[in-house]
């Protein structure tokens, strides 16, 4: 069969591996984003959090952000075995620190008058966060979340090289075969680049929509 005619079949064949990588990145980003929100509220100095908690939350985020995903994934693969789970945990762990830092900075730049107003009316801390803080920070949270998802797709693909599954594992296999696996390697790169391009375009479009919405309010 002609190599050009077989290439679309290779794309279809490796599509499940790409979907697995996207699933790893999506779950890791969601879990990491939820954890980041918790640490972001605990690490913001202007949200009436118990003062000793603020520096502790910030240092924890610093450690999580600085810890290399690859090293953590290798350790988890040694403990849990080769599967997508170690990659998901490693990426989510790093995401908590990275997004937590960004979310915390967003929190510290809010207009606190609404928070103070609700406090004067007797609202609890959770009510103030829900009704005065979240409406202000969610647009920026979403923008950072989409950008982090794009980064995590690349990270998940790289972790596949060390046995974490997904498209990275297929790339490792085809590259290891050497001569004769060029078409398969090319198909995997095309799928990965196309997926990252689509995510980047969707992320850019969403950030533009958020910016336009904020400009109108």
Predicted stretch roles:
Residues 25, 29-37, 41, 45, ...:
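Hydrophobic positions within alpha-helical transmembrane segments of bacterial inner-membrane proteins
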Residues 16-24, 68-98, 184, 188:
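Loop-to-helix entry region at the N-terminal start of transmembrane alpha-helices
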Residues 20, 24, 160, 173-200:
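Pore-lining and gate-forming transmembrane alpha-helices of multi-pass membrane transport proteins
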Residues 143, 186-217:
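C-terminal transmembrane helix and the adjacent membrane-cytosol boundary/short C-terminal tail
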Residues 1-28:
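Periplasmic/extracellular loop-to-transmembrane helix junction in inner-membrane transport proteins
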Residues 38-73, 102-105:
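Cytoplasmic-entry segments and transmembrane alpha-helices of multi-pass inner-membrane transporters
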Residues 13-16, 20, 55-65, 105-120, ...:
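Short amphipathic alpha-helical coupling elements at transmembrane boundaries
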Residues 82-133, 139-148, 201-204:
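Membrane-cytosol interface at the C-terminal ends of specific transmembrane alpha-helices
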């Amino acid at each position: 069969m002609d190599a050009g005619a077989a290439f679309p079949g290779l794309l279809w064949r490796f599509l499940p591996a790409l979907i697995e990588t996207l699933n790893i990145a999506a779950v890791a980003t969601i879990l990491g984003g939820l954890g980041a929100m918790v640490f972001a509220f605990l690490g913001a100095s202007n949200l009436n959090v118990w003062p000793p908690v603020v520096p502790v939350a910030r240092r924890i985020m610093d450690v999580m952000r600085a810890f290399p995903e690859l090293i953590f994934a290798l350790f988890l693969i040694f403990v849990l075995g080769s599967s997508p789970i170690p990659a998901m945990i490693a990426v989510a762990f790093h995401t908590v620190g990275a997004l937590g830092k960004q979310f915390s900075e967003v929190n510290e730049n809010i207009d606190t008058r609404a928070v103070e107003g609700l406090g004067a009316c007797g609202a609890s801390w959770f009510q103030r966060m829900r009704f005065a803080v979240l409406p202000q920070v969610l647009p920026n949270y979403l923008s950072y979340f989409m950008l982090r998802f794009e980064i995590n797709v690349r990270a998940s693909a790289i972790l596949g090289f060390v046995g974490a599954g997904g498209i990275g594992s297929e790339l490792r296999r085809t590259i290891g075969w050497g001569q004769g696996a060029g078409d398969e390697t090319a198909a995997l790169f095309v799928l990965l680049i196309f997926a990252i391009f689509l995510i980047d375009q969707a992320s850019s479009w969403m950030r533009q929509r958020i910016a336009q919405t904020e400009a109108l309010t």
